Curated annotation (Swiss-Prot):
GO CC, alphabetical: cell surface; cytoplasm; cytosol; mitochondrion; neuron projection; plasma membrane
Phylogenetic placement of the source organism: Eukaryota, Metazoa, Chordata, Craniata, Vertebrata
Origin superkingdom: Eukaryota
Protein name (record): Transmembrane and immunoglobulin domain-containing protein 1
Keyword Oxidoreductase: no
Posttranslational modification: N-glycosylated.
Family matches, as InterPro entries: Cell_adhesion_signaling, Ig-like_dom, Ig-like_dom_sf, Ig-like_fold, Ig_I-set, Ig_sub, Ig_sub2, Immunoglobulin_dom
Pfam families with a match to the protein in the record: I-set (PF07679), ig (PF00047)
Domain Ig-like C2-type span(s) in chain numbering: 30-114, 122-207
Extracellular membrane side: 30-220
Signal peptide range: 1-29
Membrane topology (UniProt): Single-pass type I membrane protein
SMART domains: IG (SM00409), IGc2 (SM00408)
Residues bearing attached sugar chains per UniProt: N58, N83, N118, N158, N190
Length: 262
């Protein structure tokens, strides 16, 4: 009996070691999205749709699945949650570029697979295409741009590459805009400025019409105010002097009558 007990204990230890060293994939649930177990990027285009199917593998019980769009949870129908779940992303637009969809295991949300949309589209340009400014003032031409892949940006003037003057021209570029600043505009700055965006998909352009008008000669307010004050004071002094003169004449007219009465 002692020998049998020893054999049973050794077999139990062996089985315990086997279980401990089994690969995790064989003992825990694994998620797949469209057959992929790792996060991945899905290439797509505007106007298309994408179907994302999440499934749980190696499960020993029914598993609830959750879908998230960025940080917001997606509402799923009751029959679209257990062991397998799908979402359809329809009418994909340029604004969906970079958006992530994540499938998570309900009981352990650290188990997840994410899909990031890579929406490719040619450059889209917009901006205030007509500006009138006074000579000597500053102006900014802002070309709003959206593109994926990112476009190479340039400024043209009257169909030729703009010759930048370091002292007067400044270019600023962000992921969403391409800006040309001109300080102290001059009459030769008149013309059509073109915002050019070149990508591997297409080249687009947007024209900005700049009109430089003569500088308005402002009427100096201070001299006018000073002149009005002088005129006002002159009139006041004139009235005072005239009043004194009238009073003297009245006094002279009054004196002869007084002597006659005596």
């Amino acid at each position: 009996m002692a020998w049998k007990s020893s054999v049973i204990m050794q077999m139990g230890r062996f089985l315990l070691l086997v279980i401990l060293f089994l690969p995790r994939e064989m003992t825990s649930s694994v998620l797949t999205v469209n057959g992929k177990t790792e996060n991945y990027i899905l290439d797509t285009t505007p106007g298309s749709q994408a179907s994302l199917i999440c499934a749980v593998q190696n499960h020993t019980r029914e598993e609830e699945l959750l879908w998230y769009r960025e940080e917001g949870r997606v509402d799923l129908k009751s029959g679209n949650k257990i062991n397998s779940s799908s979402v359809c992303v329809s009418s994909i637009s340029e604004n969906d570029n970079g958006i992530s969809f994540t499938c998570r295991l309900g009981r352990d949300q650290s188990v997840s697979v994410s899909v990031v949309l890579n929406v490719t589209f040619p450059p889209l340009l917009s901006g205030n295409d007509f500006q009138t400014v006074e000579e000597g003032s500053n102006v900014k031409l802002v070309c709003n741009v959206k593109a994926n892949p990112q476009a190479q940006m340039m400024w043209y003037k009257n169909s030729s590459l703009l010759d930048l003057e370091k002292s007067r021209h400044q270019i600023q570029q962000t992921s969403e805009s391409f800006q040309l600043s001109i300080t102290k505009v001059e009459k030769p700055d008149n013309g059509t400025y073109s915002c050019i965006a070149k990508s591997s998909l297409k080249t687009e352009s947007l024209d900005f019409h700049l009109i430089v008008k003569d500088k308005t000669v402002g009427v100096p307010i201070e001299p006018i105010i000073a002149a009005c004050v002088v005129i006002f004071l002159t009139l006041c002094f004139g009235l005072i002097a005239r009043r004194k003169k009238i009073m003297k004449l009245c006094m002279k007219d009054k004196d002869p009558h007084s002597e006659t009465a005596l």
